[in-house]
């Protein structure tokens, strides 16, 4: 365990002449903030500045809207000079500089304080409105540009560079602090269990102190916001070149992946066609060498009803595994017989009415008469 104690600065110490140069962090829509732009991998800082900038743009647009002509909506009944002998109600619009207090003819004696000069003229107000409009539009467009960069880009070269530089700086600080050694006037090491002092020249102690110092440097507020202060970000042209290279490589890999899939599908289709060709040849050979009457003709096949088959599950190993109740409910033979049987039923009436009945009685009488005549002729014969 290392304990840091502040040391005294020597009066003879000279300022360092080679101070690292600070470079403005890159961005697409935060140029307004200049050197305050955070590192590209600091998403919290970027979104904070975008929110503040958007609020500023909305404020300017609100100022542009408020500097326009103000119209006041009043009821006609509030104007005695216009509505003296009537109770008619209606709306009347007027500018705000007209006095809104009306109490009779004495209201026309109210003087309105007016200011003169260029700063209070209509021309200067127009200039202010145009300025607010242009500034608000520019700021909002810049905010939208930065939001598009933060949300739409899947690969951001500035972000990848900032992450890489931050990680390199952390490990470089560890190596630097390790080789610098430990000043006994600033650090003391004690054993965590026994509490006794430990020599600062041990490699384990030097390594632990170097990691602690590098971690403290990385967690510094300035380092968190800007990243390593001495690194120079890549220019906008390099940013576009790397982004274009990434997009080209992405398209190339996607096309290569699709080409592999298409080649695989084409090879499978070729194999399927060859297999179908072999199957057709085998079927043709079997048909050619089959004995007579071994293969039924189409007419014979049509006369044979298809037998309903029961398909069991592939896990069925014994008769006990067969669900007889379910199979009987699905493949009921009586239901199958009803589906396969076609019946034609005709109903004949057993009772005849009206004309048909009388005609039937007449036919019966005629037949009885003919029968009696035939019997009498038979009796007369010897």
Swiss-Prot record:
Alphabetic keyword roster: Membrane, Mitochondrion, Mitochondrion inner membrane, Transmembrane, Transmembrane helix
Signal sequence extent: none
Gene Ontology, cellular component aspect: mitochondrial inner membrane
Mitochondrial matrix topological domain residue ranges: 62-129
Mitochondrial intermembrane side: 1-44, 147-382
UniProt-annotated location(s): Mitochondrion inner membrane
Membrane topology per record: Multi-pass membrane protein
Transmembrane segments: 45-61, 130-146
Keyword Transmembrane tagged: yes
Keyword Transmembrane helix belongs to the record: yes
InterPro entries found in the cross-reference section: i-AAA_Mgr1
Main subcellular location of this protein, as a coarse class: mitochondrion
Summary of the function given for this chain in its UniProt record: Component of the mitochondrial inner membrane i-AAA protease complex required for mitochondrial inner membrane protein turnover.
Family assignment from sequence similarity: Belongs to the MGR1 family.
Subunit structure: Component of the mitochondrial inner membrane i-AAA protease complex.
Record-given protein name: Mitochondrial inner membrane i-AAA protease complex subunit MGR1
């Amino acid at each position: 365990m290392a304990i840091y104690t502040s040391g005294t600065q020597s009066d003879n110490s000279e300022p360092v002449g080679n101070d690292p140069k600070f470079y403005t962090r890159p961005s697409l829509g935060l140029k307004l903030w200049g050197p305050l732009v955070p590192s590209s991998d600091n998403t919290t800082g970027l979104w904070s500045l975008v929110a503040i900038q958007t609020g500023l743009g909305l404020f300017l647009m609100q100022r542009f809207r408020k500097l326009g002509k103000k119209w006041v909506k009043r009821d006609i009944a509030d104007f005695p000079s216009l509505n003296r002998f009537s109770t008619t109600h209606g709306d009347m619009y007027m500018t705000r500089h007209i006095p809104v207090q009306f109490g009779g003819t004495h209201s026309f004696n109210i003087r309105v304080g007016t200011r003169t000069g260029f700063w209070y003229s209509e021309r200067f107000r127009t200039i202010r409105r145009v300025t607010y409009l242009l500034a608000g539009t520019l700021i909002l467009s810049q905010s939208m540009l930065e939001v598009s960069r933060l949300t739409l880009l899947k690969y951001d070269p500035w972000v990848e560079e900032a992450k890489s530089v931050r990680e390199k700086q952390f490990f470089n600080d560890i190596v630097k602090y390790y080789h610098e050694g430990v000043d006994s006037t600033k650090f003391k090491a004690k054993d965590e269990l026994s509490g006794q002092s430990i020599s600062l020249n041990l490699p384990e102690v030097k390594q632990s102190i170097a990691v602690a110092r590098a971690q403290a440097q990385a967690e510094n507020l300035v380092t968190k916001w800007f990243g390593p202060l001495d690194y120079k970000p890549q220019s906008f042209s390099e940013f576009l070149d790397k982004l274009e290279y990434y997009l080209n490589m992405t398209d190339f890999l996607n096309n290569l992946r699709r080409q592999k899939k298409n080649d695989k599908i084409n090879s499978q289709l070729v194999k399927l066609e060859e297999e179908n060709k072999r199957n057709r040849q085998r079927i043709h050979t079997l048909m050619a060498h089959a004995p007579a009457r071994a293969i039924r003709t189409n007419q014979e096949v049509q006369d044979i009803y298809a037998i309903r088959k029961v398909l069991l599950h592939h896990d069925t190993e014994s008769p006990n595994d067969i669900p007889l109740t379910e199979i009987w409910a699905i493949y009921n033979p009586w239901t199958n017989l009803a589906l396969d049987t076609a019946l034609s039923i005709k109903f004949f009436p057993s009772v005849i009415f009206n004309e048909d009945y009388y005609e039937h009685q007449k036919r019966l009488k005629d037949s009885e008469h003919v029968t009696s005549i035939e019997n009498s002729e038979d009796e007369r014969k010897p």
